[in-house]
Each structure stands twice: as C-alpha cells, then as structure tokens.
Design a protein with these regions (language model features):
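A short beta-loop-alpha structural element at the N-terminal edge
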Residues: 3-17, 25-30, 82
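Active-site rim helix/loop that mediates acceptor-substrate recognition in acyltransferases
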Residues: 37-64, 68-69, 115-120
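Conserved beta-strand in the GNAT
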Residues: 66, 72-81, 129, 134
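Conserved GNAT acetyl-CoA-binding A-motif
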Residues: 126-128, 156-167
Length: 211
C-alpha cells in the first residue's frame, strides 16, 4: 500500500539521498560529486545536513513529501511556490560545511565548481516548482513516483497555483517518462558548453503542465 505524507526531520538521510540522486540523474557523477569532490558517503552526509539545516533552502525537509510502501520509504520530492528558497542555498551549504569540518578555503571553491548549473536554469514565474525527485531503484516502475507527483500537484492546486514545472538533465529518459505520465509536457530546454563539459549532459529540460 502506497502512503504519501509530509516529510519529517528524521527523514533527513532519505531526503538527502533523493537530492543527491536527483542531481546525478542518469549519470555516474552529479552536481554534488563535482562540487564536493568526495566519495558517495561524504556527499550523502553533506546532503543530509542540508535537509536539516536552519537555513530553509530548496533542500530543506519542510518542503518535501515522501511516499511509503507498507511503511518503507520509497520516494521523495520537494515542491514550492517561492523561489527564494534557492537563494538560501549558500547559507545551508555553509551550515553543512561547518558541521563536517570543511574549512573556509575549501568551501569557497564549491560555487566555483558548481556555477555551471546556472547556465541552463529556466523557470516560469508564478509556477509551482517540483525538485529533488528520487525513487529507490526497487520501487521504480511500480507507480510510487506517479502517486507522489499526483499528490504534489494536488498540494499545489490547493495552494492556489495554476501551473507546475519540473526540470531534469537532458538524457534522463526514465525521469522524463515518469513526468509525462502525469501530464507534464515540454516547455523549454537550455544547453551550454560549460554545462556539458562539467557534468556530461548538454543541459536541462523543463516540463510544465496546468493544474
């Protein structure tokens, strides 16, 4: 049985995993790998700390919903209508860095390494944004992701939003298929040489739908 509920702080490790997986998509290395230059365990711990930071960034636990299958965490995503949560990212990363003993010199390199992401960002003003979608491999193709997305669309509708949007790495066909199954359609894509050189995907594709 699939149950969808709001995330809680104690879900932090799973939410961090979802954020890490979403940033990696279909690739072997994602934004966190490139920025942090650590192994997977290091990146996952950093991501976990982002979700429970005081700074309410787009990684914060309070923005997430999770889907459980018979009481087991299976999928997560976050959604928001206020893009100011993106601007809290540096503060959240600073908190995570301090907590992991990362010195200021190393932390200063994070945005230099990760700035390529800005080249391909696109957004529709006033739309509800869905981010950090992650589903455990054993639950992919079972309807869990669709149930979670449908729940998020309803949440956005109740909040008064008329449109929702979601972006992902170009080439992540599995994600695109899942999003199209709940009514999302192509809206825009951006490509940039520096983006592809850094991560191996030509850019980001954005889908949108009315709600």
């Amino acid at each position: 049985m699939i149950t969808v509920r709001p995330a809680r702080p104690e879900d932090g490790a799973f939410l961090g995993w979802a954020s890490y997986e979403a940033a990696r998509g279909h690739l072997t290395r994602g934004w966190f790998d490139i920025v942090l230059q650590g192994d997977e365990a290091f990146c996952l711990e950093f991501s976990r700390r982002l979700t429970i930071a005081e700074a309410k960034s787009w990684w914060h636990w309070s923005l997430f919903s999770v889907a459980e299958v018979d009481g087991t965490l299976a999928a997560a995503l976050c959604g928001f209508g206020d893009e100011s949560v993106y601007y809290a990212s540096p503060e959240a990363m600073h908190e995570a860095s301090e907590g992991m003993g990362i010195d200021q010199t190393e932390e200063a390199q994070f945005w230099t390494r990760g700035s390529f992401i800005v080249s391909c960002v696109s957004s529709e003003p006033g739309a509800w944004t869905i981010e950090n979608v992650g589903t455990r491999p054993e639950y992919r193709g079972t309807g869990v992701t669709q149930a979670l997305l449908q729940h998020e669309l309803e949440r956005a509708h109740v909040a008064g939003f008329k449109q929702a949007q979601i972006s992902f790495l170009i080439g992540n066909d599995r994600a695109e298929h899942a999003y199209r199954k709940v009514g999302f359609a192509f809206a825009e894509e951006k490509r940039a040489p520096d983006f592809e050189a850094a991560i191996g995907s030509p850019g980001l594709r954005r889908l949108a739908r009315d709600i």
